[in-house]
From Swiss-Prot:
SUPFAM superfamilies: 4-helical cytokines
Organism field: Peromyscus maniculatus
UniProt name for this protein: Interleukin-21
Name of the gene: Il21
InterPro entries tied to this protein: 4_helix_cytokine-like_core, IL-15/IL-21_fam
Lineage: Eukaryota, Metazoa, Chordata, Craniata, Vertebrata
Signal peptide: 1-10
Glycosylated sites: N77
One GO location term (cellular component): extracellular space
Amino acid sequence: VVIFLGTVAHKTSPQRPDRLLIRLRHLVDNVEQLKIYVNDLDPELLPAPQDVKEHCAHSAFACFQKAKLKPANTGSNKTIISDLVTQLRRRLPATKAEKKQQSLVKCPSCDSYEKKTPKEFLE
């Protein structure tokens, strides 16, 4: 602890990046990579959350993660697609605000979202 002009400053690491923000950036990169292989995905329709209210963003993202993005029988790309989908399914770090809101807010179920093709789903 350093005392400077009557104020107490804790000696900690510099502002560490927000874990949630880093994770979201990583997920956006994964989605961009999946778009390259969209023609190699199983054409099953998927629930695609759109126009999600801020307080339901975590719930909508959970629906996105639960979607059955599956590689079609495409040989070598199958492994790449499977790895990207696995990375998409990793849990997001929770925030304190989310923990409070989860008990207060009712958000739409995954089944209530319009179903779209994998290409539209990844947009």
